């Protein structure tokens, strides 16, 4: 376990916000959690779990303890002719796990290449891209309650997965520190190529689908649309794509015939938040140190020196204008930390 006081966070969040935390703690194993459960000072402090800081926005310095996983390793639990079950440490970098799966010919997560963050965060956020959500592949999440010390295995159904949602986003489950995530990946060749943007590139460039070619293509597409946080601070997609009723969508389509849409199994329709934002004139918008990325309106950026409150203010301005123009309220995918 590594403990640091008055710790700078500019390199611990992809927005590059120059906040600080009173305490930063890296945990690596169950024994570290056991120690924290017995520590009186820790138990009296405000605690927030944090991954790679790729899906949050610090609005101020954090007064308390940020708890960060350094649990590493990949263990093979079971293997048959069709699939393999892997247990992965929550502190492993997500894209390193994707690369490992591709190198070993394990199918299922190649479409999720280059998504920033840790393995633990994948289970919290239910990350998704190019037609795949990680909840389709998660069997179980192993967690420790950092107040009581309780150990619990959350089966997939326990996590109540939905679009960009899991039970771990609820306040009642915020004090669970994720230790490991179990993924069942496929051993037989099988690809998810229903997503139009990905399928179009593969077809136009006559790329034969393989694990590596799909990973390479996804990485290329993402790099063309999203800025590198090392160069321009950002948290990727800032807003969740809204889901509206069929009736609401039909009304919108009458006024905006070119509006993109993704029909959902329950009859509702998902609308790209980036398109809504772009229609309000924000693509490429800049106000001082903050702005909207020129190649993807869903991405808010820190050009250097911006505060979290400045980014948050731009987000609220966008929310208000989208609501006024379309009657749709956008919700941040990024978590605000006060």
Swiss-Prot record:
Active site feature: 164, 237, 333
Membrane-crossing segments per the record: none
Gene Ontology biological process terms from the UniProt entry: cell division; cell wall organization; peptidoglycan biosynthetic process; regulation of cell shape
Catalytic activity: UDP-N-acetyl-alpha-D-muramate + NADP(+) = UDP-N-acetyl-3-O-(1-carboxyvinyl)-alpha-D-glucosamine + NADPH + H(+)
Pathway stated in the Swiss-Prot or TrEMBL entry: Cell wall biogenesis; peptidoglycan biosynthesis
Record has Ribonucleoprotein as a keyword: no
InterPro entries: FAD-bd_PCMH, FAD-bd_PCMH-like_sf, FAD-bd_PCMH_sub1, FAD-bd_PCMH_sub2, MurB, MurB_C, MurB_C_sf, Oxid_FAD_bind_N
Keywords: Cell cycle, Cell division, Cell shape, Cell wall biogenesis/degradation, Cytoplasm, FAD, Flavoprotein, NADP, Oxidoreductase, Peptidoglycan synthesis
Localization terms from the record: Cytoplasm
GO annotation, cellular component aspect: cytosol
Stated family: Belongs to the MurB family.
Protein's name in the database: UDP-N-acetylenolpyruvoylglucosamine reductase
